């Protein structure tokens, strides 16, 4: 049975691989659409132009996917799964005990902390540069926001509840809402200026939307879209990490309470 299954899998991979290679070898791409795009782009970075100028709706959808992912994490690992009142009554915990915190999270060794802090600072700086320069160089809001969130996660892992780089959960909620709302409002502004939602405009009454050197073509509202996406990704990934961290602390407290009851 196993040999027949392996043979079927091998044949399937062979047929699929041969089909892909055949398609790539005989692929013909009409340059018409490409020429239209390259004629009308106003941003010096092709990749960023694709993400925000030509498929901004798709980028908005990706942001909403991240929103849904964070909401699901909150449902599964957040307060909706654990009723604080029930847990306090069950395990005779004091009223002042808050289960949704990172208190009690242990720290790593001094060597890890010594290396983690400067690395976190450098990652935050790199993330900011990546967001602000995404319309000129490779990068953007997604990459920069992920870098800053990774710096936050690294600092929390190394320092625990005493992390020097800390985002309060309420602050993350506001930051995520600000990023998503900023993206939507910029799209509305484009609709009022150019007649199309998320239309990229470069100036209003002669005033440049985003300042740029004379030798660099202005990018319009795309830098602001990058900032909005960066805030959204930073807050979303950090919130997911926060919820998973709270889950760890909750499980530890429940285990300790069960041991005391036994």
Swiss-Prot record:
It is a multi-pass membrane protein. NCBIfam families: PRK06281.1, PRK12579.1. Keywords: Cell membrane, Membrane, Transmembrane, Transmembrane helix. This is Uncharacterized protein MJ1307. The chain crosses the membrane at residues 7-27, 58-78, 114-134, 140-160, 179-199, 216-236. Disulfide bonds: none annotated. One of its GO terms (cellular component) is plasma membrane. It comes from Methanocaldococcus jannaschii (strain ATCC 43067 / DSM 2661 / JAL-1 / JCM 10045 / NBRC 100440). The keyword DNA damage does not apply. It is found in: Cell membrane. The keyword Nuclease does not apply. Pfam families: MnhB. PANTHER family: NA(+)/H(+) ANTIPORTER SUBUNIT B, NA(+)_H(+) ANTIPORTER SUBUNIT B.
């Amino acid at each position: 049975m196993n040999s027949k299954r392996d043979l079927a899998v091998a044949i399937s991979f062979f047929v699929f691989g041969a089909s892909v290679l055949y398609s790539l070898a005989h692929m013909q791409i009409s340059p018409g659409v490409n020429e239209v795009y390259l004629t009308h782009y106003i941003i010096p970075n092709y990749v960023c132009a694709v993400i925000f100028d030509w498929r901004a709706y798709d980028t908005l959808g990706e942001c909403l996917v991240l929103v849904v992912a964070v909401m699901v994490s909150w449902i599964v690992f957040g307060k909706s799964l654990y009723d604080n009142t029930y847990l306090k009554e069950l395990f005779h915990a004091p009223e002042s005990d808050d289960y949704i915190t990172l208190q009690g999270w242990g720290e790593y060794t001094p060597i890890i902390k010594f290396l983690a802090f400067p690395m976190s600072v450098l990652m935050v700086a790199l993330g900011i540069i990546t967001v602000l320069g995404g319309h000129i160089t490779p990068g953007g809001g997604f990459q920069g926001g992920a870098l800053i969130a990774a710096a936050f996660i690294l600092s929390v892992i190394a320092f625990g509840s005493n992390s020097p780089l800390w985002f309060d959960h309420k602050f993350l909620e506001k930051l995520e809402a600000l990023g998503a709302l900023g993206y939507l409002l910029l799209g509305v502004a484009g609709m009022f200026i150019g007649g199309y939602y998320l239309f990229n405009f470069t100036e209003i009454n002669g005033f440049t939307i985003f300042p740029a050197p004379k030798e660099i073509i202005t990018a319009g509202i795309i830098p602001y879209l990058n900032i909005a996406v960066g805030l959204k990704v930073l807050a979303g990934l950090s919130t997911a990490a926060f919820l998973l961290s709270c889950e760890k602390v909750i499980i530890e407290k429940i285990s300790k309470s069960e041991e005391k009851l036994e």
